[in-house]
Every structure is written in structure tokens, then in C-alpha cells.
Amino acid sequence: MAFLKKSLFLVLFLGLVSLSICDEEKRENEDEENQEDDEQSEMRRGLRSKIKEAAKTAGKMALGFVNDMAGEQ
């Protein structure tokens, strides 16, 4: 009977240890995914700001060109 109790205790203990290891790995994977998502959103924000800045510059150049053309006539 004592042998069965020890065996059962050992099985339960090893099960708990493996569950805690799996939970830890799962949390690490979720953290990595969240970090990748943050990096991607930062890249998108940077890309959007660059596109916006390029559009502003192009608009100013086009407006200047139109003003120059209107001034020549």
C-alpha cells in the first residue's frame, strides 16, 4: 500500500512539474508573439509617417509648380 502511495505521489508530482513547464513555455511564446506584434505595429506607424511626409512634400512641390506656372502666364 505504501508503495502505491509513493508511486501515485511521484506520478502526481511529475505531472505538476510538466504542467508548470508547459505553462512557462506557453507564456514565453505569447510574450514573443506580443513583442513581434508590437514591432510590426511600430514598423507600420513608421511607414505611415514616411508616406504621409512624402505626400506632404509632393503636394508642396506640386503647389509650387502650379504657382510658378500661373505666375508665368
Swiss-Prot record:
Residues 1-22 form the signal peptide. It is found in: Secreted; Target cell membrane. One of its GO terms (cellular component) is membrane. Pfam families: DD_K (PF12121), FSAP_sig_propep (PF03032). Antibacterial peptide with activity against Gram-positive and Gram-negative bacteria. May also be active against fungi. Residues 25-47 are annotated as: Disordered. Keywords: Amphibian defense peptide, Antibiotic, Antimicrobial, Cleavage on pair of basic residues, Fungicide, Immunity, Innate immunity, Membrane, Secreted, Signal, Target cell membrane, Target membrane. It comes from Phyllomedusa sauvagei. Its main location: secreted. This is Dermaseptin-S13. Residues 30-40 have a biased composition (Acidic residues).
